[in-house]
Amino acid sequence: MQNKYPLLSQIDSPEDLRLLGKEDLSALANELRTYLLDSVSQTSGHLASGLGVVELTVALHYVYQTPFDQLIWDVGHQAYPHKILTGRRDQMHTIRQKNGIHPFPWREESPYDVLSVGHSSTSISAGLGIAVAAQKENAGRKTVCVIGDGAITAGMAFEAMNHAGALHTDMLVILNDNEMSISENVGALNNHLARIFSGSLYTSMRDGSKKVLDKVPTIKNFMKKSEEHMKGVIFSPDSTLFEELGFNYIGPIDGHNIEELVKTLTNMRELKGPQFLHVRTKKGKGYEPAENDPISYHGVPRFDPASGKLPQSKIVPTYSDIFGNWLCEMAENDEKIIGITPAMREGSGMVEFSKRFPTQYFDVAIAEQHAVTFAAGLAIAGYKPVVAIYSTFLQRAYDQLIHDIAIQNLPVIFAIDRAGVVGADGQTHQGAFDLSFMRCIPNMTIMCPADENEMHQMLYTAYKMQTPTAIRYPRGNARGIALQPMAELAVGKARIIHQGKKVAILNFGALLSEAQEVAISHNYTLVDMRFVKPLDKTLISELADSHSLLVTLEENAIQGGAGSAVNEYLQQIGKIKPLVLIGLPDMFIPQSTQQESYADFGLDAKGIDQKIKLALS
């Protein structure tokens, strides 16, 4: 390693980094970028975001005394270079793997990971809390939050900045802007002006003038507005927004000019009050395929970096593909069907729909709360909104789900992707709770397809209904079953897959094939329940009468899930039967492959069989 990475091989912590001369930092950044590409191409993971913040990461750890100074990364996709520089370089081959290092900053993993993350737009709120605590204790530590131009569009980020501006707390927010959406004013002049506005002379004059003008409020307000206007003209019109929130805006500066980054950050480290640094970067920087197609190279499987070709592994369509195709099929005949996504177009299978039906497609950015209530408004106006959202992100709009959809009994369809175990992204991304938090909401109909054909029929059934509906389906490839013509399902009715004896397995969702292997092997009854709400109560009652053991199977937390619903009903009708609930345990599910998680928690055929045998013994 020393031959290929002579500088990086010496860096076991930021303390080692800070021993380097400034003249070595560019060479280190080049080595870090190459190492990141070599590492991720062998393991899979998030690539383009990390490539874009290499210089910024080096500069931050060079200027700030981490971990004494607190560095917080929003979301965490871009934190791979941070992990490499903070003692985890030689563990990068384990990232996103079972018992390996976490794909996002994780507090239990390193003192350099101040905040555990995975969802977006949380950094400034947490950073403000950390900064306030440091100020109360006179700790002298600095707080820095790095947030992307996607994450900063979320309401939570602006709520935090509004509060920070009011408190006038010492903290730095860095906007990592890797799009052209905010500003294009990047260049030598802007870098020079950023150094002036962050420098000690300008800052001293600014702060001294404020103290004098505090006694003359009218003139002080005029000067403040003049400064905001000047920055808006020189830097970016967007600077006015952040200045109005109470931040001192600097930028935009070139996020790949490490010399300018170090100079500007060194100046800003000494500034008081809320500071905002706008840094322009290029996602995928330094690797041409990722620069040209940052979306495809955002998260990558293992690939050959020399060719830059990503493997085409999909023979069977994914459940997301099935959803996207259904949406296009429906939109061909109904201009009132509307597709909504909170910044997950590619992941939710909506690319084709967005291109073919642009007037019926809305990407509301990272704004799950808004997405749900926006759908409510469309439904009130007579449209048929379909909200495509990951299970883990629907959690962020729970009040809107209840207050704006369910109470008004509006016909909004929720296509809940990544329900159940998602694999390598770990605790923050598992779809473990949606059945539990939706099942208690009145007016909701909840469906769990066992395969893509059933999913197809359920989506159509939801389309025909005039009440809120949710269809939850897993990450990954479907089963390869041919789709039948669309037809409505009988709401709340299950279907018996195999009629057996003694044991009845009530399956909710896509684990049906695992359950079927066990049922056929032992001649157990197997039921595809289809609906979590309403349950097929008649069938459950009959099965309780005719079988000595009932088993529920679901890819959701056992607490409050589908099995709990069956148990509650049996208690209600006084049929106290032996009942085995198989699902996800009371813990946050760590990273691994989906198959490893199924085996670990007894959700594969072997585990199901063992749990039933234990109950029968």
From Swiss-Prot:
Binding site for thiamine diphosphate: H77, G118, H119, S120, G150, A151, N178, Y287, E368
Catalytic reaction list: D-glyceraldehyde 3-phosphate + pyruvate + H(+) = 1-deoxy-D-xylulose 5-phosphate + CO2
Gene Ontology MF terms in the entry: 1-deoxy-D-xylulose-5-phosphate synthase activity; magnesium ion binding; thiamine pyrophosphate binding
GO biological process, one term: 1-deoxy-D-xylulose 5-phosphate biosynthetic process
CC cofactor note: Binds 1 Mg(2+) ion per subunit. Binds 1 thiamine pyrophosphate per subunit.
Protein EC: 2.2.1.7
Keyword Protein transport: no
GO annotation, cellular component aspect: cytosol
Pfam families associated with the record: DXP_synthase_N, Transket_pyr, Transketolase_C
Pathway: Metabolic intermediate biosynthesis; 1-deoxy-D-xylulose 5-phosphate biosynthesis; 1-deoxy-D-xylulose 5-phosphate from D-glyceraldehyde 3-phosphate and pyruvate: step 1/1
EC class of the enzyme, as a word: transferase
InterPro entries: Dxylulose-5-P_synthase (IPR005477), THDP-binding (IPR029061), Transketo_C/PFOR_II (IPR009014), Transketolase-like_Pyr-bd (IPR005475), Transketolase_BS (IPR020826), Transketolase_C (IPR033248), Transketolase_CS (IPR049557)
SMART domains given in the database record: Transket_pyr
Keywords tagged on the record: Isoprene biosynthesis, Magnesium, Metal-binding, Thiamine biosynthesis, Thiamine pyrophosphate, Transferase
Its job: Catalyzes the acyloin condensation reaction between C atoms 2 and 3 of pyruvate and glyceraldehyde 3-phosphate to yield 1-deoxy-D-xylulose-5-phosphate (DXP).
Family, as annotated: Belongs to the transketolase family. DXPS subfamily.
Name the UniProt record assigns to this protein: 1-deoxy-D-xylulose-5-phosphate synthase
